[in-house]
Design a protein with these regions (language model features):
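Non-catalytic structural scaffold of enzyme domains
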Residues: 1-252
């Protein structure tokens, strides 16, 4: 069976896992590194240490065929080995979808303010009539990690509107969900801003995973869940998402 390790600092990995298991039967090792939540508030130096230690931990404990770093923040800011698949904003695809040639990237503060994202955008060498707006959406990520997107949707809609109302009045018609947590808010975002197309990179990551696997004889999907934080509390949060798998503690 193909074994795929997927990690993030919280619940965000689940959106990536769902996309992977739709197209690739596999055993998923899901590690929620809650001890280091949120990645989006860590410095580049801190992230470099955390990510490299986490990759080593997963390799030594589980020997995965593929490791997925299911977070935009370290994917953009930390250099890893070829075995690791990251999550990057699908900027070229988003620009192709846009009629106004004005797109937005919604991400954590660390990503939005990073030189790494600016350098990544420059690689596309867009003409001056094409605009990429970077939007700090850390407060929206918190809505997911706190489970408010399940328990208090009215509050979430207020925060979404307050955060993005002015942004989306500026010709933006396509927005990239550049945090795996934001996938869980996609329906709420679309209901508040129906004129905006929200692009989720999860499907692209899943296709990259499938392409990296040379041979797959797996016939069913399984998932084992670990956390570096409070396993009991994380289990409750996971239950609210309809996932009943046992959560085990994994020391980092």
């Amino acid at each position: 069976m193909v074994r795929i390790a997927v990690f993030d600092s919280g619940l965000g990995s689940l959106s990536i896992i769902n996309a992977i298991q739709k197209i690739c039967k596999s055993e998923i090792i899901y590690f929620a590194d809650q001890k280091n939540f949120p990645y989006g508030k860590k410095s580049k130096k801190q992230l470099d240490t955390i990510i490299k230690q986490t990759i080593k931990l997963l390799e030594e404990n589980f020997s995965p065929d593929v490791i997925v770093m299911a977070s935009n923040t370290p994917s953009l800011m930390v250099n890893t080995n070829r075995k690791v698949i990251g999550v990057h904003p699908p900027i070229r695809e988003a620009m192709m979808f846009s009629k106004t040639k004005n797109i937005a990237i919604l991400g954590t503060r660390a990503v939005i303010k990073s030189k790494s994202l600016s350098s990544y955008i420059k690689k596309f060498n867009f003409s001056k009539d094409k605009k990429v707006h970077k939007i700090n959406s850390s407060i929206l990520v918190e809505l997911v990690e706190s489970n408010k997107f399940i328990t208090d949707k009215i509050y979430c809609k207020k925060i979404i509107k307050k955060t993005l109302d002015d942004v989306f009045s500026d010709k933006i018609d396509v927005a990239i969900l550049s945090s795996t947590h934001l996938s869980f808010l996609r329906s709420l975002l679309s209901s508040e801003f129906p004129q905006v197309k929200f692009v989720d990179p999860a499907d692209i990551v899943a296709r990259n995973v499938l392409a990296s696997i040379k041979q797959n004889k797996s016939k069913k999907n399984t998932i084992k869940i670990f956390t570096s934080g409070n396993a009991k509390l994380f289990g409750k949060n996971r239950n609210r998402l309809g996932i009943r798998n046992k959560v085990s503690f994994l020391s980092t």
